[in-house]
């Protein structure tokens, strides 16, 4: 009987200890942000099309359909392009969470006031995570964007 009581107490202590440790497993320190939903991305741009004319210059950027809330395409140089999800990583589930392009200056979310560099890194505002980046492949004048 005493052994049974000791086993019960030990089981309860183990349960309490495990329960107390679980919140400590949250690496974000309690500031967990919801994740941007996943969406299949497979887009192609013809860089010589007039609608893509901003991509003829370094740091030129355009927005296109695709992804969760759209895709931002940025030209780094003639042979290097970056593509990002327009859904802001700060509060991605807010209906107004959509990053916009201020030509040749910055990327910004008017909803939460976060600002991002043309490499997708947060520069100002509450966002601490970079924009979700998609893969790009250039073949002649055809830019393919995938995830």
Placement of each model-derived feature along the sequence:
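Residue-level recognition of alpha-helix boundary/capping or hinge positions
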Residues: 1, 55, 106-108, 122, ...
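Bacterial N-terminal signal peptides that target proteins for export
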Residues: 1-13
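Eukaryotic intrinsically disordered, low-complexity regions
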Residues: 10-14, 25, 30
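C-terminal motif of bacterial Sec signal peptides marking the signal peptidase cleavage site
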Residues: 20-24
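N-terminal pre-ligand scaffold of iron-sulfur
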Residues: 27-104, 115-117, 132-147
């Amino acid at each position: 009987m005493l052994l049974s009581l000791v086993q019960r107490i030990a089981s309860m202590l183990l349960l309490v200890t495990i329960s107390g440790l679980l919140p400590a497993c949250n690496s974000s320190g309690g500031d967990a942000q919801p994740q941007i939903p996943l969406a299949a991305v497979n887009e192609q741009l013809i860089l010589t099309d007039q609608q893509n004319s901003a991509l003829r210059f370094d740091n030129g950027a355009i927005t296109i359909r695709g992804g969760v809330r759209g895709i931002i395409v940025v030209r780094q140089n003639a042979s290097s392009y970056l593509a990002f999800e327009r859904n802001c990583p700060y509060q991605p589930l807010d209906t107004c969470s959509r990053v916009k392009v201020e030509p040749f200056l910055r990327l910004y979310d008017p909803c939460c006031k976060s600002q991002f560099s043309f490499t997708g890194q947060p520069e100002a505002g509450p966002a601490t995570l970079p924009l979700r980046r998609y893969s790009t492949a250039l073949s002649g004048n055809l830019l393919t964007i995938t995830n």
